[in-house]
């Protein structure tokens, strides 16, 4: 039977519940246990797929096509276990399921209520497909006290009673702030947060205290006394220089051992933190550096490209070089400033995106990379912009465009049901935004002796997609005659998945999102190759 660990947050949000959960998962795995991590999000959206990146950050896509919270990216990168649709649930999804059943009459005329119908559905989600796991870690989004999170907190309280307290552990992550003016660390916010949690019926078993400074023993004793938690279970987590130090920080505090002690379990093997020590050393102490420009319209919010940032870091780890990310807002990028802004850049990356805003800046940056032989990687929308730039400037198709933002031009890029084999437009169908995506993992076959096949060292790959628009295969021959090779296609040869320039040191565009599959201990080959090219660029 699986044992369940529930991670809640208090005082403020964005304290690092996801990273803490992911770090704990790795530590338990390193002790010989199977672990799965799940996220319970209290917002009313069915999923984050249609939410603005400024509101929610990155949308992380799983192999089976779920649009999920970015924390699932942390889970995968730290644990090495691929997430599933069943690992992320939202209030919107829960209510949709319950209301659908009500409309079908499955509740036999009963009054549908938060308790028991909503809470029962949450408990079903927690327990689903968990029988083969040793531990299931469930992170509850938001903080204790939020109105939105109340059904989830009530559900996990009930769940602990259902499975027995010996099979359920509550971890509460709180902020222990440092006041510079008085040079003091304050424990009162943590005390009040735990008081709030206890008022709902949950007594935390472990408290993780996030602070920018080490917490004195007297303060930890105070938290132990007022929150009714053993002093050994008051865990300190001080701000680290890189997130990859987090597992080592929790290992030092013996978080994993305290969890095993609670469940009366022993370590199956010694924990091995050497891989993490190695990569943090490369990140923090490597003198060799490369500057990579990320040109997009969501660069103001770091979380908007979280997996991408991490994948580039992984590429740096593999090449033993520090990667400096230079974020450039494509909406504000003027043609006259491109040369100046990209002067000391060793590689240019255009990430995924949607809509017309910022397209001109992206296209001009791609042109600069192509003409000046600067290593270039275009991801999803970035590949489509590279196609448009090449069509306009090399194929002389001046009206080449995407039907996503221009319905009058030549649709080099369009919805798959908007064009036919001869490239002519046909009428598409209107659907909900959330239901028209090509989502999840798909196969692609690679061209023999192409740059991309040498990078992957394979003829067939499987990568994750998240897009509505595709490159029109009807233009393939025209592009290849001018030197842009369609080096990756869908197995049926209908959908271009990868393009590369013949007469360029490193110019690749991919329709998928390779960043979702990169991990610190197993960097994605595409990012390793890109950083290597940037490292060698002069």
From Swiss-Prot:
Tell me which Pfam families the record gives: CTP_synth_N, GATase
Key words of the record: ATP-binding, Glutamine amidotransferase, Ligase, Magnesium, Metal-binding, Nucleotide-binding, Pyrimidine biosynthesis
Instruction: From the record, give the cysteines joined by S-S bonds.
Output: none
Residues that bind UTP: 13, 186-191, 222
GO terms (BP aspect): 'de novo' CTP biosynthetic process; pyrimidine nucleobase biosynthetic process
Task: Report the GO molecular function annotations.
Answer: ATP binding; CTP synthase activity; glutaminase activity; identical protein binding; metal ion binding
Please state how the activity of this protein is regulated: Allosterically activated by GTP, when glutamine is the substrate; GTP has no effect on the reaction when ammonia is the substrate. The allosteric effector GTP functions by stabilizing the protein conformation that binds the tetrahedral intermediate(s) formed during glutamine hydrolysis. Inhibited by the product CTP, via allosteric rather than competitive inhibition.
Chain residues that bind CTP: 13, 146-148, 186-191, 222
Q: Which GO terms describe its cellular component?
A: cytosol
UniProt keyword Manganese present: no
**InterPro entries linked:** Class_I_gatase-like, CTP_synthase, CTP_synthase_N, GATASE, GATase1_CTP_Synthase, P-loop_NTPase
Question: What function is annotated for this protein?
Answer: Catalyzes the ATP-dependent amination of UTP to CTP with either L-glutamine or ammonia as the source of nitrogen. Regulates intracellular CTP levels through interactions with the four ribonucleotide triphosphates.
Similarity remark? Belongs to the CTP synthase family.
Instruction: Name it.
Output: CTP synthase
Species: Pelagibacter ubique (strain HTCC1062)
User: What is the primary gene name for this protein?
Assistant: pyrG
């Amino acid at each position: 039977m699986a044992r369940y660990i529930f991670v809640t947050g208090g005082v403020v949000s964005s304290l690092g519940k996801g990273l803490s959960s992911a770090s704990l998962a790795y530590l338990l795995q390193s002790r010989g246990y199977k672990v799965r991590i799940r996220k319970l999000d209290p917002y009313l959206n069915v999923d984050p797929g249609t939410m603005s990146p400024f509101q929610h950050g990155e949308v992380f896509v799983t192999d089976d096509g779920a649009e999920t919270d970015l924390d699932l990216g942390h889970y995968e990168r730290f644990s090495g276990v691929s997430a599933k649709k069943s690992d992320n649930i939202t209030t919107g999804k829960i209510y949709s399921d319950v209301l659908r059943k009500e409309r079908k009459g499955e509740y036999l005329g009963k009054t549908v209520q938060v308790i028991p119908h909503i809470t029962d559905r949450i408990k079903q989600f927690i327990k689903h497909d968990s029988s083969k796991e040793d531990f299931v870690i469930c992170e509850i989004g938001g903080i204790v006290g939020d109105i939105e999170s109340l059904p989830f907190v009530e559900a996990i309280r009930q769940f602990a009673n259902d499975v027995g307290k010996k099979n359920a552990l509550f971890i509460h992550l709180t902020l222990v702030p440092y006041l510079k003016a008085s040079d003091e660390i304050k424990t009162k916010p943590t005390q009040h947060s735990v008081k709030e949690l206890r008022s709902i019926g949950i007594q935390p078993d472990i408290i993780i205290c996030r602070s920018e400074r080490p917490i004195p023993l007297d303060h930890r004793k105070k938290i132990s006394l007022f929150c009714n938690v053993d002093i050994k279970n008051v865990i300190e987590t001080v701000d680290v220089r890189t997130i990859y130090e987090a597992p080592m920080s929790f290992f030092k505090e013996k978080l994993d051992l305290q969890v095993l002690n609670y469940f009366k379990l022993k370590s199956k093997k010694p924990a091995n933190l050497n891989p993490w020590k190695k990569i943090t050393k490369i990140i923090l102490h490597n003198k060799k550096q490369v500057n990579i420009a990320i040109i997009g319209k969501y660069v103001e919010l770091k979380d908007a490209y979280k997996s991408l940032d991490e994948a580039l870091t992984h590429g740096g780890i593999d090449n033993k070089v520090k990667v400096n990310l230079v974020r450039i807002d494509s909406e504000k990028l003027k043609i006259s400033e491109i040369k100046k802004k990209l002067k000391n850049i060793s590689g240019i990356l255009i990430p995924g995106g949607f809509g017309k805003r910022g397209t001109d800046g992206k296209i001009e940056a791609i042109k600069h990379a192509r003409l000046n032989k600067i290593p270039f990687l275009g991801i999803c929308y970035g590949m489509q912009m590279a196609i448009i730039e090449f069509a306009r400037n090399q194929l002389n198709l001046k009206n080449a465009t995407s039907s996503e933002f221009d319905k009058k031009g030549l649709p080099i890029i369009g919805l798959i049901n908007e064009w036919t084999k001869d490239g002519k437009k046909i009428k598409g169908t209107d659907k909900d935004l959330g239901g028209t995506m090509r989502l999840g993992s798909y196969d692609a076959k690679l061209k023999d002796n192409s740059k991309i096949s040498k990078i992957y060292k394979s003829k067939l790959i499987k990568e994750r997609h998240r897009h509505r628009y595709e490159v029109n295969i009807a233009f393939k021959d025209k592009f290849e005659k001018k030197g842009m090779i369609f080096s990756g296609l869908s197995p049926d040869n209908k959908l271009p998945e990868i393009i590369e320039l013949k007469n360029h040191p490193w110019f690749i565009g991919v329709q998928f999102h390779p960043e979702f599959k990169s991990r610190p201990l197993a960097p994605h080959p595409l990012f390793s190759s890109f950083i290597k090219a940037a490292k060698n660029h002069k």
